[in-house]
């Protein structure tokens, strides 16, 4: 990947996309992780005075992530607010009379965060910028109407392994680059722990699938896992179907 060309293309994409919305500001949910750091840095380069971050921790969130998110915003001149989502999560727990699984609570947390981002976008006349990478999108590793929701997404065609390298080029803090990727949905949660494979292994196969290359050299169990995830989760990337009754 040519980092200089990629940076220029993405900044141009962000500026053009924002201009078409007739709003003024970028809003990014900043977790202290890699993807949101890269996206918010690109937004800050595109519109230095018009980039806002919301930091949305829960009680279970790693305090290091909170500190990294704050440090990142201050380094890049991103105006930010911190809003705890714990009251929303507790209200959800209190409203249910059944056992709430981690996946249900995690999805709820992702949707609460996105609700707060969209509410903030209305407050300041802005748009929510997406932070889901190509690896996550192909695997369906995200919450529909949660972290997958956005007005536009500058990193949606970059694999996670590419983002690691691109982040170094952008001078993202090493402590953010080196930490284990996590959606921060529950205590101790990690992407690779959930998926059962590291991103390097996943991306190699995903890249081959995307380019319609032979998969013969790869482990069949891993291929099956990836192909099943792609098939079962592709609905997350589609707009709701509408039955066309007119015309």
UniProtKB/Swiss-Prot annotation:
Pfam families xref list: NAD_synthase
Free-text function comment from the UniProt entry: Catalyzes the ATP-dependent amidation of deamido-NAD to form NAD. Uses ammonia as a nitrogen source.
Binding site for ATP: 29-36, 131, 160, 182
Gene3D superfamilies according to UniProt: HUPs
Organism per entry: Campylobacter hominis (strain ATCC BAA-381 / DSM 21671 / CCUG 45161 / LMG 19568 / NCTC 13146 / CH001A)
EC number of the protein: 6.3.1.5
Keyword Nucleus: no
UniProt-listed InterPro entries: NAD/GMP_synthase, NAD_synthase, NH(3)-dep_NAD(+)_synth, Rossmann-like_a/b/a_fold
Official protein name in the record: NH(3)-dependent NAD(+) synthetase
Binding site for Mg(2+): 35, 136
Subunit structure: Homodimer.
Catalysed reactions, semicolon-separated: deamido-NAD(+) + NH4(+) + ATP = AMP + diphosphate + NAD(+) + H(+)
Gene from which this protein is expressed: nadE
Annotated residues for binding of deamido-NAD(+): 111
Keywords per UniProt: ATP-binding, Ligase, Magnesium, Metal-binding, NAD, Nucleotide-binding
GO molecular function: ATP binding; glutaminase activity; metal ion binding; NAD+ synthase (glutamine-hydrolyzing) activity; NAD+ synthase activity
Pathway where this protein functions: Cofactor biosynthesis; NAD(+) biosynthesis; NAD(+) from deamido-NAD(+) (ammonia route): step 1/1
Gene Ontology biological process terms in this record: NAD biosynthetic process
Family: Belongs to the NAD synthetase family.
Cellular component, GO annotation: cytoplasm
